[in-house]
């Protein structure tokens, strides 16, 4: 099988052990799955183990119900020297009614690590399709926004001391 190294799809059945007090799937369980999917996508692309640097724009659009299939559609959007932005779209499917819903989206930045647990270089991502190019350009903007936000937070921290 010839799977693209920059994409990954994973489907998981939502079981009763994942519910919150409202009977829906607990957001924390979804966050853990998002991190696992981002790890799998980024590490396969990089050929190295990775660690999570940041989780951006996690948007829970609709509740997820027990018994639904949750499909995670992950793709590498951008690479830095050692970092990889992975975008994930989450689709929920009701097995009985066949209703499919877009329930979550987010972006995770992962950093590739060498055997000495130091950041290591990753292959440059070169978008090919129009969708990949759009996601690549949006990832550059998000990266710039993260840097700007970090600078603002640092100014706030320094002014408090």
Residue ranges, per PLM feature:
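Hydrophobic beta-strand-centered segment that forms part of the acyl-chain substrate-binding groove
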Residues: 2-7, 25, 36-78, 83-84, ...
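HotDog/MaoC-like acyl-thioester-processing domains
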Residues: 5-10, 65-66, 77-161
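Residue-level recognition of specific faces of alpha-helices
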Residues: 11, 30-33, 57
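A conserved, well-ordered hydrophobic junction motif at loop->secondary-structure transitions
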Residues: 19-31
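N-terminal hydrophobic or amphipathic segments with adjacent small-residue motifs
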Residues: 17, 21-22, 61, 111
